[in-house]
């Protein structure tokens, strides 16, 4: 794997391999590389979980983390992202994890020697989040085939929804969508069925909630926090209708008492904290796959 830019670029075999490697890392597997590797985390949007779990993953792998602060970089002087990455490549950085507000920011960067991991591109995709979600689901159910998965909330503005709906359908899951119609893109119907939340909760094995992305709205939102929770959120009453073995997921950050009732965030059915934990192991698997391929290509070049 040279880069990780989108879920669509991964084959089912590659996905299964990454999930298997993540499981091994969770059981204590150690990675070894023939040469010292360097990574840089370039975040142009706020992040807590993605940024910190990539850094923890890098350090667990023995990868040196190169500091980067967008606000104090030469990009504030007009340097392009391409030239910034060219610099990182020139000084010996192996992989760049990038979070950016622009969708498809990585177009035109793929042919650089430095590997690129998409840490989220606007409303586009979030492949490492999607992979950790898959890892969490597989840990619970052992398969994706035939699972009923709900994606509920601010779907139109969610890169997580965009990644997950495509890959879950490929893996054999049945998808359901819910949330405000004005925040729903009809193109999603190619992947699943839209249902009112009260009808959906009784059907699904996985209830995947999405954050209301206030920063991507025009500022004229139609709902107060209280009205959103009442109409579309996972309330205590709705959660009581979930199947006995159903799980609750959320990519975080969570708006408590908006998408989900406060007391449900750390409840028995919730896998929200587990998702955060699993993020480290799946990101270790991603980085290992990229760095091992770099080692293999370097070895071939010596012959």
Swiss-Prot record:
GO terms for molecular function: amino acid binding; aspartate carbamoyltransferase activity. Its EC number is 2.1.3.2. It is an enzyme of class 2 (transferase). InterPro entries: Asp/Orn_carbamoyltranf_P-bd (IPR006132), Asp/Orn_carbamoylTrfase (IPR006130), Asp/Orn_carbamoylTrfase_sf (IPR036901), Asp_carbamoyltransf (IPR002082), Asp_carbamoyltransf_Asp/Orn-bd (IPR006131). The keyword Transferase applies. One of its GO terms (biological process) is 'de novo' pyrimidine nucleobase biosynthetic process. Pathway: Pyrimidine metabolism; UMP biosynthesis via de novo pathway; (S)-dihydroorotate from bicarbonate: step 2/3. Belongs to the aspartate/ornithine carbamoyltransferase superfamily. ATCase family. This is Aspartate carbamoyltransferase catalytic subunit. It comes from Listeria monocytogenes serotype 4a (strain HCC23). The gene is pyrB.
């Amino acid at each position: 794997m040279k880069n990780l830019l989108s879920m669509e670029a991964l084959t089912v075999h590659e996905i299964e391999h990454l999930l298997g490697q993540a499981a091994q890392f969770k059981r204590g597997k150690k990675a070894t590389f023939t040469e010292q590797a360097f990574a840089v985390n370039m975040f142009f949007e706020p992040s807590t979980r993605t940024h910190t779990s990539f850094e923890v993953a890098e350090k667990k792998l023995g990868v040196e983390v190169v500091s980067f602060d967008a606000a104090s970089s030469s990009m504030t002087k007009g340097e392009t992202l391409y030239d910034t990455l060219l610099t990182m490549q020139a000084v010996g950085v192996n992989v760049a994890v990038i979070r950016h507000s622009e969708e498809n920011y990585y177009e035109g960067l793929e042919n650089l020697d430095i590997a690129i991991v998409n840490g989220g591109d606007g409303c586009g995709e979030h492949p490492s989040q999607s992979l950790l979600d898959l890892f969490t689901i597989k840990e619970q159910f052992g398969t994706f085939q035939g699972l009923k998965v709900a994606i509920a909330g601010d779907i139109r503005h969610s890169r997580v929804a965009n990644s997950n709906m495509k890959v879950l359908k490929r893996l054999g899951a049945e998808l359901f969508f819910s949330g405000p119609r004005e925040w729903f893109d009809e193109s999603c119907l190619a992947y699943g069925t839209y249902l009112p939340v009260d009808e959906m909760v009784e059907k699904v094995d996985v209830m995947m909630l999405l954050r209301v992305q206030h920063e991507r709205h025009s500022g004229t939102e139609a709902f107060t926090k209280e009205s959103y929770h009442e109409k579309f959120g996972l309330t205590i009453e709705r959660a009581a209708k979930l199947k006995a073995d159903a799980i609750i997921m959320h990519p975080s950050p969570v708006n408590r008492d908006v998408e989900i009732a406060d007391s449900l965030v750390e409840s028995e059915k919730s896998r929200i904290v587990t998702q955060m934990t699993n993020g480290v192991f799946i990101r270790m698997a991603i980085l290992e796959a990229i760095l091992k391929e770099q080692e293999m290509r370097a070895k071939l070049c010596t012959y």
